[in-house]
UniProtKB/Swiss-Prot annotation:
Domain of life the protein comes from: Eukaryota
Keyword rRNA-binding: no
Name of the molecule in the record: UPF0489 protein C5orf22 homolog
Ranges annotated as biased composition (Low complexity): 183-196
PTM annotation (Phosphothreonine): residues: 15
Entry annotated with the keyword Phosphoprotein: yes
Bias (Basic and acidic residues): 197-215
Source organism: Mus musculus (Mouse)
Residue ranges, compositional bias (Polar residues): 218-228
Length: 442
């Protein structure tokens, strides 16, 4: 890790590795801020290693950027999908590494270099990234429209679980009946370690793409290649971590098994209508900047209109009200949607309907309920990856089970396996089960 100005040398050290386990993911941020305040983490240049089925890299759309400098006000504004970027704008995180499973493909693979800053026209936080993940939420602005710019290096890296093909030394694994090899996206070694650095003057979003996007089937003959991928990718992540002064390990348990809870709330036809109403068509990759501005403006108006529709329906969903909104271009399917909802429930939760719609842009939320075997393969992949990296300053874990993103029937089992991995790698832990009323320590 870097040692700029001796910052790292002046940091305090924990006797035992703190592990904070929360329910909703945004609840980890106060513990990271606490570590900054106690000088266990630096105020800036923190690397953030984020294992999750969701990027969590959106931004509270209407929150004034300066809210980040009032931490109590900030914590009250955050939700599960938008808690990381405010910490980037505040200057704390400079490198974010999103490690994702095969079923989560929300952001393009590779290295993304862009700016996070204050939009001079709206005073909200915005980015210069042109990835559809940000465009679909109306978060892109040109560089010259930002002030107080913070450069961010975002590396998106795929973690692939493979079954064990060759005999493996029991001493080099977490205790398990199945000990698969680590396999990570083969394109990532070049993407993350190509020598390209993010600079504050970069325009837009520089992306080094993956060389392959397909999920490859495990093969015993490929075990040597898998080990090479493991070494190369771990080395690339290590190079990224070296540019920071400290690193935080963050794990969402839905990384190992994930549900799209909205699929259980709505019928197939209702969900299809939501996809039609909220759809976002990805722009051409060669669209000029002014064209992207137009795309974002149109998308913002679309989302504002839909928010107004469902806010109005919360006040009253009479046939007259529904027909009035449905007469607008693109809103015709509102009539069958409301009719279907009212048949199934006495009082539809239109606010929840809107929240579900917001997830239906250019792709669906990931949905993959893993078998116990699949979970074990991913657990071992994570073990071998972390074994190649330095010890983090602290670990944060989100259960994500009360909102059904991590299957509630699996979450305790997954949590136990993750804590076993951490104990195996780092020894005695200072574990805080924040989600539990008793919050025991171990």
């Amino acid at each position: 890790m870097s040692d700029t100005g001796g910052d790292r040398a002046r940091l305090r050290r924990y006797t035992k590795l703190p592990v904070w386990v929360v329910e909703d993911h945004q609840e980890v941020l106060p513990f990271i801020y606490r570590a900054i305040g106690s000088k266990h983490l630096p105020d800036s240049n923190i690397s953030f290693l984020h294992l999750d089925s969701h990027p969590d890299l959106l931004i509270p759309v209407n929150m004034p950027a300066d809210t980040v400098f009032d931490k109590e006000a900030l914590f009250g504004e955050l939700s599960i999908e938008n808690w990381i970027m405010p910490a980037v704008y505040a200057g704390h995180f400079s490198q974010v590494i999103w490690l994702h499973p095969t079923w989560a493909q929300q952001i393009r693979e590779g290295k993304h270099c862009f700016l996070v800053g204050k939009d001079i026209s709206t005073t909200t936080i915005r980015v210069t990234s042109t990835d559809s993940y940000f465009l679909s939420d109306g978060l892109f602005v040109p560089e010259d429209q930002l002030e107080n710019r913070r450069p961010l290096q975002l590396d998106v890296i795929l973690v692939e679980p493979y079954t064990l093909c060759s005999k493996q030394d029991d001493s080099d694994s977490v205790s398990s009946t199945k000990k698969p090899k680590l396999a990570l996206g083969s394109g990532e070694s070049s993407a993350a370690a190509d020598g390209h650095s993010c600079s504050e003057g970069r325009r837009g979003d520089a992306v080094t793409p993956r060389s392959d996007h397909a999920c490859q089937e495990p093969s015993c003959s490929r075990s040597g290649g898998q080990q090479s991928q493991n070494t190369a990718t771990a080395g690339a992540i290590l190079d990224i971590l070296k540019t920071g002064d400290a690193f935080v390990l963050d794990i969402d348990l839905d990384f190992f098994s994930v549900k799209n809870p909205f699929k259980e709330m709505f019928t197939q036809d209702e969900y299809k209508i939501l996809q039609e109403l909220y759809q976002f068509k990805k722009p051409d990759s060669n669209l000029p900047e002014d064209g992207l501005v137009d795309v974002v403006e149109a998308r913002t108006h679309q989302l504002e209109d839909l928010e107004a529709v469902f806010a109005d329906l919360c006040d009253g969903d009479s046939e007259e009200t529904v027909q009035s909104w449905a007469s607008n271009p693109g809103m015709e399917s509102l009539v069958p949607l409301v009719q279907s909802l009212k048949k199934r429930m006495e009082v539809p939760d239109y606010e929840m309907v809107h929240q579900a719609g917001l997830t239906c842009d250019y792709s669906e939320l990931p949905h993959h309920i893993s078998t116990e075997e699949e979970i074990e393969y991913l657990i071992q992949s994570v073990y071998f990856l972390l074994k190649s990296l330095p010890k983090p300053t602290l670990v944060t874990i989100a259960r994500s089970s009360l909102d059904d993103y991590c299957p509630p029937e699996q979450v305790d089992m997954i949590q136990g396996k993750v804590l076993d991995v951490l104990h195996s790698l780092y020894g005695t832990l200072d574990t805080h089960l924040v989600y539990s009323e008793e919050s025991p320590l171990s």
